[in-house]
């Protein structure tokens, strides 16, 4: 809001009209018409801008002085301001910023014009003849002697002076500057707790010994949760897409049933080996476009496997661990069996209830058609399938579950583990290739849902963090069991297909088995996709750990 012209004391309207302050209204009118005609913009061609400004000032002065009310207000305000500013202008020699003593500043203030409430209407007070020393310190800077920014400089402005020291007392005292180290020590010692004082007396840590930190407190790096799912997989993100290029190598050297599976597409090929790649096929299953949700339709298969992730931010993550090459080899145990084509899926002692169920020796497939001479059978012994990696993993999971923060489990976690153990079951079903009713029963993939990422708060961070890791460990065990048994089924089925290619077979009898090959190939492809989804889940989990410091 603009001020009214009669209250603007910064402009002398009498000087603009070139009149005395006691001029009458008629003189003001006559002088205005004369000057308006002289400074009219039409009378000043070539200098219109300057003429317009002068003409506007004349109009403003005539408006204020021709009105009796406005003129009275203007005369009162302008006269008061004129006397105050002209007669009582503070002396520039008595700059309060030059006084370095509290006594000098106080004594000087007694003679100032602001010491009396009627200073604006009384006469100019007598200046004291006493002179003070104006010595300035050698360490002063430019901004110390700057005048205050408020309009009227008072004698009490030493309050805002940075050099004024209220502890100096009466008289002139020299204030010496303390060393930086002593100043920091004195300032910090007044506010530090007792524990910090004790640590301080022991001696501060020298940050110069660690030039990489530059004297700053090093940030605590959150530990990354390493996957304990299975040795079948690599935690390196570069090996996520390599599972689709998996190849099976069959060794011809000694054991006709020994082969090696490597999940890495860049694995070195052994000598004297031939590759058996799974042929391409057109899948009949409908999959979703969502990369983290895979569900088979009820028309094709009753099983489903799904991953649901809440967090959509996926920053880059690089793991320092190298991919582990896993191998599955059929070996010959010492004990003989009545069936020469039975496979043992457990060789180590059971670790838990699920391990006991897995270690049951079940004939995977039997047939009376493939009769070979005794010379072709190596020592008439049964072929056992060694599963040392899985037992080692289960033992590690048991050790991990007995950690200090995992000793006690909630009722929800125990119920979750019990339900999943019962629903998981044995993935191995008998593959019957008998002459009467040949059939291949595909294993049903259980629904294993990873726990959703928790939303932490500062209050229940520790409680929810512990519950989440308990649930995640239960999921890791179930998923490891599923992956291991599925891989066993795939390897055994490939071995059967190899044997069927070697021995002549009457395909009229085994028509159903031939049709089951395509189903097995689809199962293998879906299993590879499940592996990839699981790796992406672990990648998201590591990113969330680094972001929120969940460990």
Swiss-Prot record:
Residues 85-122 have a biased composition (Polar residues). Transmembrane segments: none annotated. SMART domains: DnaJ. Residues 85-153, 176-226, 334-359 are annotated as: Disordered. It is found in: Cytoplasm, Cytoskeleton. Pfam families: DnaJ. Residues 124-133, 176-187, 203-219 have a biased composition (Basic and acidic residues). GO terms for molecular function: Hsp70 protein binding. Residues 134-146 have a biased composition (Basic residues). Residues 12-78 form the J domain. Keywords: Chaperone, Cytoplasm, Cytoskeleton, Microtubule, Sporulation. GO terms for biological process: exocytosis; sporulation resulting in formation of a cellular spore. The keyword Transcription does not apply. GO terms for cellular component: cytoplasm; cytosol; microtubule; microtubule cytoskeleton. PANTHER family: DNAJ HOMOLOG SUBFAMILY A MEMBER 3, MITOCHONDRIAL. Has a role in sporulation. This is Meiotically up-regulated gene 184 protein. It comes from Schizosaccharomyces pombe (strain 972 / ATCC 24843) (Fission yeast).
């Amino acid at each position: 809001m603009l001020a009214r012209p009669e209250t603007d004391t910064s402009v002398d309207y009498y000087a603009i009209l070139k009149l005395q302050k006691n001029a009458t209204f008629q003189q003001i009118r006559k002088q205005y018409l004369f000057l308006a005609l002289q400074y009219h913009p039409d009378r000043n061609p070539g200098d219109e801008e300057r003429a317009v400004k002068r003409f506007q000032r004349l109009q403003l002065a005539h408006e204020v002085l021709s009105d009796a009310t406005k003129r009275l207000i203007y005369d009162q305000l302008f006269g008061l301001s004129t006397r105050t500013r002209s007669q009582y202008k503070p002396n520039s020699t008595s700059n309060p910023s030059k006084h370095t003593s509290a006594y000098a500043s106080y004594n000087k203030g007694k003679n100032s014009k602001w010491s009396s409430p009627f200073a604006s209407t009384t006469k100019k007070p007598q200046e004291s003849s006493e002179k003070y020393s104006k010595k300035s310190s050698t360490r002063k800077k430019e901004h110390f002697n700057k005048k205050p920014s408020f309009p009227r400089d008072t004698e009490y402005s030493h309050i805002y002076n940075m050099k004024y020291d209220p502890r100096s007392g009466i008289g002139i005292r020299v204030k010496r500057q303390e060393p930086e180290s002593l100043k920091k020590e004195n300032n910090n010692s007044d506010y530090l707790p007792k524990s910090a004082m004790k640590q301080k007396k022991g001696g501060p840590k020298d940050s110069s010994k660690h030039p990489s930190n530059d004297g700053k407190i090093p940030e605590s790096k959150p530990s990354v949760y390493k996957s304990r799912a299975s040795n079948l997989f690599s935690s390196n993100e570069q090996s996520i897409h390599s599972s689709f290029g998996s190849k099976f190598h069959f060794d011809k050297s000694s054991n006709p049933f020994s082969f090696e599976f490597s999940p890495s597409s860049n694995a070195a090929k052994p000598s004297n080996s031939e590759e058996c790649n799974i042929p391409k096929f057109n899948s009949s299953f409908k999959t979703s476009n969502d990369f983290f949700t895979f569900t088979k339709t009820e028309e094709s298969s009753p099983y489903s496997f799904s991953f649901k992730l809440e967090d959509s931010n996926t920053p880059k993550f690089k793991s320092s661990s190298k991919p582990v090459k896993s191998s599955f080899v059929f070996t010959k145990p010492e004990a003989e069996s009545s069936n020469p084509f039975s496979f043992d899926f457990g060789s180590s002692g059971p670790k838990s209830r699920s391990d006991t169920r897995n270690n049951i020796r079940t004939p995977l497939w039997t047939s009376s058609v493939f009769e070979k001479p005794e010379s072709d059978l190596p020592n008439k012994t049964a072929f056992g399938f060694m599963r040392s990696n899985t037992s080692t993993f289960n033992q590690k999971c048991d050790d991990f579950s007995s950690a200090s923060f995992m000793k006690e489990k909630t009722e929800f976690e125990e119920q979750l583990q019990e339900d999943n153990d019962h629903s998981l079951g044995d993935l191995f079903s008998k593959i019957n290739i008998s002459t009467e009713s040949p059939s291949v029963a595909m294993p049903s993939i259980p629904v294993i849902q990873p726990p959703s990422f928790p939303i932490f708060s500062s209050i229940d961070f520790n409680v929810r963090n512990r519950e989440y890791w308990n649930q995640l460990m239960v999921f890791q065990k179930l998923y490891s069991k599923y992956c291991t048994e599925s891989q066993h089924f795939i390897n055994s089925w490939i071995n059967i297909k190899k044997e069927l290619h070697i021995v002549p077979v009457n395909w009229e009898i085994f028509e159903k088995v031939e049709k089951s090959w395509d189903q097995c190939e689809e199962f293998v492809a879906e299993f590879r996709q499940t592996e990839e989804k699981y790796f992406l889940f672990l990648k998201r989990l590591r990113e969330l750990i680094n972001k929120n410091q969940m460990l």
